[in-house]
Amino acid sequence: MSATAQTLRPPSRTLMFLEGRAIHELGAFLGALPLLSLAPKGDGHPVLVLPGLVASDTSTRPLRSFLGSRGYAVSGWRQGRNLGLRDGVQHAMVDLVRELSDTSGRKISLVGWSLGGLYARQLAKMMPDRVRSVITLGSPFAGNPKATNAWRVYEMASGRRADEEDGRFGGSLSETPPVPTTAIFSRTDGICAWQGCMEKPSARSENVEVESSHCGMGHHPAVAYAVADRLAQPEGKWAPFDRSGWRSMVYPDPAR
């Protein structure tokens, strides 16, 4: 971990208190559905959506429903609340990736919100032959594990230290998965330090910035569009997100 990553601090109390805007972002998502219907349609490949800390498939239902309307075979993670890597959780996710891939005969895409994004990255490292792409939403994979306002909740829920990495689950969190990877982040995230949610740009990895809360990222209209856009790319023909035209007014330059 770099010196910069080690010194990252959690978001300010002001940003944390502003997380209440997530409910308004859900309203904006519902209101934007007619416009979101213009998002690219997919090719029907399986998409597994993984929830954040202490959240369940209920939290990802709006995004999964939207992606289903775009033509994808969407699945939740089917394990109730995400309480961290408790006994059996890792094996259940691996089994589900195998099931979705074997049933469809295709590689699957992984979309993970917050802690779910960490799982998505590690699963892709373990099973690159079954994973087509990875998209993370506000997932703190690159910074100090305690540069969040949720690390104590994680330790209580999981029974594990926040800085404890399991080498048997994909190795280093900050290492980029060997598949096309998009990290969606927000500088106004009130839970995770945004700097720790950014990927190292490369020929197959990128960052997409949105203006969103952390708790509303899974149902923010700009996030939903970006996820649909990324998933719609033909397999083997990945290209970075296009911010030209109207998109430049919605998606800030992540490198600024």
Predicted regions and their residues:
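Flexible, membrane-associating and regulatory peripheral segments of lipid-active enzymes
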Residues: 1-47, 65, 70, 103, ...
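Short, mixed-charge, low-aromatic patches
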Residues: 15-22, 46-54, 179-187
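Short amphipathic alpha-helical segments enriched in hydrophobics
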Residues: 27-30, 57, 231, 235
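Short, flexible segments with low predicted structural confidence
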Residues: 38-39, 64-65, 95, 198-199
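Serine-dependent carboxylesterase/thioesterase catalytic core
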Residues: 45-51, 56-58, 62, 68-179
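Amphipathic alpha-helical segments
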Residues: 62-63, 227
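Helical cap/lid subdomain of alpha/beta-hydrolase-fold lipid enzymes
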Residues: 125-126, 131-256
